[in-house]
Amino acid sequence: MKLTVVGCTGSMSGPFSPASSYLVQALGEDPQTGQERVFNVLMDLGPGSFGALWRYIDARKIDAVLFSHLHADHIADVVSLHVHRRWFPTGPLGPILLAGPDGLMDRVRGVDGVGPEETYAGEFTPHILTAGEPITVGPMTFTPYPANHTVPAFGFRVQGPSEGNPLEQVELAYTGDTDTCDSIIDMARGVKLLMSEAGFTKADKPRGVHLTGERAGAIAKEAGVELLVLTHIQPWTDPRVVIEEARMEWEGAISTAYAGATYTI
């Protein structure tokens, strides 16, 4: 599998990155043609991310979009995706899987500013996430785990073929937005890469909203991950501060996400 950071700024688009969006890719057999091809799945599609995605893939080739939760900084560019798929110059591109928490399509209509008569049937096949029920896209499996956030939210554990050896299965995990909770620790156990939000620093006191670097580091330590990548850092926060806080708990490999970063798993 390959993971590309399309956008990673916390809570909004920023001067150096769009808001949250992560592209996961893997080579597998197309069930319709029997030929091998690259499958493309997006986890979240925040403001500015759809345009940025064009730097990395042909946007017509998206197979699925999975939303960790329905806050605008993680879903707003679904409207751009809808317009692209409905009005592409050579004709409609057809529906793709759109998965998220309960209330998904009402939220999409709200962002789009349309009423219940809009079904998006030509662009999206909606699916409501259920904790522990995996979604399979090509050779990849995405299993949602409940997160600890202000609205219903999930993290994803992703299993798929190794880039180095397609016969080997490897795993990564993405927290979405969350504070510490047992289910997110379970999600991260033993993965090669944990993409963990760190939207707060130690100076931020509210709980049940975001992780700090320190709390993300503690999750990485307890879960036994190989690489911790900190993301969803606010544009006013120095990433070095978040790294320093994570180092209070985590002694392993660590980095901060940035737009365009790629990781082969």
Where are these regions (language model features)?
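Binuclear metal-dependent hydrolase catalytic cores
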Residues: 1-174, 179, 184-186, 243-265
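Cap/insert and terminal regions of metallo-dependent hydrolase folds
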Residues: 180-264
